Amino acid sequence: ITEFPLKAQVLPEGAIWEFDSYEDLCSFDADFFLNVDSRIVDNICRVVGCERSAITGVSPIKEGISNLSFLFTVDGEGFVYRHPGSGTNEVVNREAESYSLGVAKELGLDHTFLYEDTVEGWKISRYIPGCRSFDYGDGEQVRVALGLARSLHQSGKTSPWSYEPFEESEGLVALLKEAGYPLPENFSTLSADIRKLSYLSSLEDGKKVLCHNDFYGPNLLVHDGGMELIDWEYSAMSDYACDIGNFVAQGSGYSVDEAINILPL
């Protein structure tokens, strides 16, 4: 193609309206939220127990990696609605997640959970204002975080589902190949090394316990009232070392000695 002609249709001022936020749209059409056909709005009303008119302050949350989430307010109380990202239901067992969320709430590890639809994968949680990013360099925060993990591992709670990190990773690779995604250079060599390490670690496997399996900084909400362990999408029975390994490997920046020093905590 050497040419790509474009034609423009010039419209008069005021013919097209641009809205930067939900509030802008509602200012233009006060009845929009009351009349819009949205299962998401219906889900909120059913779980929270409110009328559509009570839902205000809708704003997107940009921190999510794989899901689409937004914040909203009902009668002055904040909530978060999570809509599962495209393809996430292929890699996340929503029944296992919902089960573990119930356990986490019972154990006092996550006070935010309200409801999850195990078929569609959407979830509603309470919003905790004033949360701070977890600091791997703060000894007290590290102590509290590892205490949450220990409480889970030693709770005696079990799950009908299990999670094997290497097997799960192989499943993800298969999905990527099926979708035609290019794998990194020398991936086969790295995969072989990981397979060998997985085998060696399996020789020392102890009793499986209920684990979070995504235990690292972004999933630890630090606030004035304590700390919450959120995002239980991969939680199931596993080797407790999986949680410790995640905590160290995903962004801690620890040296080998620093990683060893946190183990007694």
Language-model-derived ranges and their functions:
Residues 1-4, 152, 221:
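A short, conserved alpha-helix in the catalytic core of glycosyltransferases
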Residues 1-17, 23-32, 92-93:
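Catalytic-core segments of class I nucleotidyltransferases/pyrophosphorylases
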Residues 21, 143, 264-265:
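Helix-rich C-terminal or lid/interface subdomains of diverse kinases
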Residues 37-57, 154-213, 223:
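An alpha-helical support segment within catalytic cores of ATP-dependent transferases
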Residues 59-166, 181-189:
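ATP-binding pocket architecture of kinase catalytic cores
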Residues 59-81, 198-242:
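Active-site acidic catalytic loop and adjacent metal/ATP-binding pocket
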Residues 86, 130, 227, 235-237, ...:
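Activation segment
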Residues 241-265:
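Active-site activation/catalytic loop segments of kinase-like enzymes and analogous catalytic loops
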